[in-house]
Design a protein with these regions (language model features):
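Non-catalytic terminal segments and appended small domains
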Residues: 1-135
Length: 135
């Protein structure tokens, strides 16, 4: 496995293979990664899950306890599970896949994060040729 460098990530952004609800800030692009950002679509849910062959929109309907407004100063409750759509979306080519891991800041703040995809079979793994949203 090899990693994309900053210039390769920029090329994917320029070509629309990585795109966002908001413009991608140049500071999000790191030497060998892209910092992902939360959208305003966030839900407190009953349990964590791996999508497998289930649409995430259906899981939201089944597991959602409440919608969380991230447009205001919001305090996320301790020991609760939240599902947030990320601003960034992907149209990966067949020869590129992705791996995600939290920034060290989230660990220092005692926040546990995972990334999931539609029909994903494991946390923090984005399959080759994936097209869709990230959560």
């Amino acid at each position: 496995m090899s990693y994309l460098n900053r210039e390769q990530i920029k090329t994917l952004i320029k070509s629309g293979q990585i795109y966002s609800n908001k413009s991608i800030d140049k500071n999000q692009i790191q030497p060998a990664s892209l910092d992902l950002t939360l959208s305003d679509k966030c839900y407190r849910i009953k349990a964590s899950f791996i999508p497998n062959n289930i649409k995430i929109s259906n899981v939201i309907k089944e597991l959602s306890l409440s919608r969380v407004n991230l447009n205001i100063n919001t305090l996320l409750e301790k020991n609760c599970i939240y599902l947030c759509e990320l601003n960034e979306k992907l149209k990966l080519p067949k020869d590129i896949m992705g791996k995600s891991n939290p920034k060290s800041t989230t660990g220092r703040l005692d926040i546990f994060t995972r990334v999931i995809t539609e029909n994903g079979k494991e946390y923090d793994s984005i399959k080759y040729n994936y097209k869709g949203k990230l959560y």
